[in-house]
């Protein structure tokens, strides 16, 4: 029983599934349905690797976009980023579906002997699934940070473009209007008159293309926000449930340890009692022998 209780805590909460969950699967893979369970965990883990690569790719594309000054180049980057964000959404929804499937299987697995709610196997499955949910929530949060960075740096780029063309810093309301509408021709009217329409049109086209790119990317990235919120709710709810289970198991461990201590103490007392009983018997035998000798006085019989 101690081994079972101890085994249930081999997976620290919050540990990454690659370092914790899969390792636990290797240790207990053949136990009561865990082998198949951890194969599915590994499938999900590979999807997280894809999300990591896509996040880095999107971050690199975003950095590249900040130095682009031509509309065609901006359009090409936009196309690449939209494709990558679409793939992120597909993977995230796939993972979410697999996690929901694991939840259903975890409930069904409790019907097996030795796998009831709160058992070592059940806690291993629940903790691993919770870890995967937390990982998805954290990944979606990273993409939301990317969305916020794109929005903020888009504002900085537009501000620089206006200054480059007009030689003047635009106020916040002007920048807000540009970001909101993408219509910059009115703002650059003076520059068009001074420099000629042809020289300014490239900048106007690039700003419009950038506006469209940021708007479309933000919409797609916001779609991931719902997955983040769903995972946040599940992680909080299931985390609290797991805390309660672990608290109960911890209490059970304490009771078992207390019982073992009491048992050892009882054995020690029993051993000491036997020891003193033997000593008392020996003393009693000595006293009886002395009394018998004193009564019989065998040395007088010899003298007679």
UniProtKB/Swiss-Prot annotation:
Residues 1-30 are annotated as: Disordered. The lineage of its organism: Eukaryota, Viridiplantae, Streptophyta, Embryophyta, Tracheophyta. Part of the t-SNARE complex. This is Syntaxin-132. GO terms for biological process: cell division; intracellular protein transport; vesicle-mediated transport. Residues 34-67, 129-162 form a coiled coil. It comes from the Eukaryota. It comes from Arabidopsis thaliana. Residues 297-304 are vesicular. It is a single-pass type IV membrane protein. Belongs to the syntaxin family. Its main location: membrane. The keyword rRNA processing does not apply. Plants silencing SYP132 exhibit reduced root hair length. Vesicle trafficking protein that functions in the secretory pathway. Acts in coordination with SYP123 to mediate tip-focused membrane trafficking for root hair tip growth. Functions in root hair elongation by forming SNARE complexes with VAMP721,VAMP722 or VAMP724. Involved in cytokinesis. Acts as a cell plate-specific syntaxin, required for the fusion of vesicles at the plane of cell division. Required for secretory trafficking to the plasma membrane during interphase. GO terms for molecular function: SNAP receptor activity. InterPro entries: SNARE (IPR010989), Syntaxin (IPR045242), Syntaxin/epimorphin_CS (IPR006012), Syntaxin_N (IPR006011), T_SNARE_dom (IPR000727). Residues 1-275 are cytoplasmic.
């Amino acid at each position: 029983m101690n081994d079972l209780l101890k085994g249930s805590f081999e997976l620290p909460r919050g540990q990454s599934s690659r370092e914790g969950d899969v390792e636990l699967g290797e240790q207990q893979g053949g136990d009561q349905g865990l082998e198949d369970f951890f194969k599915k965990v590994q499938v999900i883990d590979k999807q997280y690797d894809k999300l990591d690569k896509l996040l880095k790719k999107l971050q690199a594309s975003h950095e590249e976009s900040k130095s682009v000054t031509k509309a065609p180049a901006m359009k090409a980057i936009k196309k690449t980023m939209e494709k990558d964000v679409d793939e992120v959404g597909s993977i995230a929804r796939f993972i979410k579906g697999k996690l929901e499937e694991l939840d259903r299987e975890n409930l069904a697995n409790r019907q097996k002997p030795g796998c009831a709610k709160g058992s070592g196997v059940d806690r291993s499955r629940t903790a691993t699934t919770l870890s995967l949910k937390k990982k998805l929530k954290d990944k979606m949060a990273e993409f939301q940070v990317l969305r916020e960075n794109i929005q903020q740096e888009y504002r900085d780029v537009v501000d620089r473009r206006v200054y480059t063309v007009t030689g003047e810093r635009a106020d916040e309301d002007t920048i807000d209007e540009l970001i909101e509408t993408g219509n910059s021709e009115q703002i650059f009217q003076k520059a068009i008159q001074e420099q000629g329409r042809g020289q300014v049109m490239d900048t106007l086209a690039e700003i419009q293309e950038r506006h469209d790119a940021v708007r479309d990317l933000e919409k797609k990235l916001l779609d991931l926000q719902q997955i983040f919120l769903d995972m946040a709710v599940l992680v909080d709810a299931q985390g609290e449930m797991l805390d309660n289970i672990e608290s109960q198991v911890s209490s059970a461990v304490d009771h078992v340890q207390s019982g073992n201590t009491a048992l050892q103490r009882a054995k020690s007392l029993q051993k000491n009692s036997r020891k003193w009983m033997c000593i008392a018997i020996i003393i009693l035998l000595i006293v009886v022998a002395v009394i018998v000798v004193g009564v019989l006085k065998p040395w007088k019989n010899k003298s007679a």
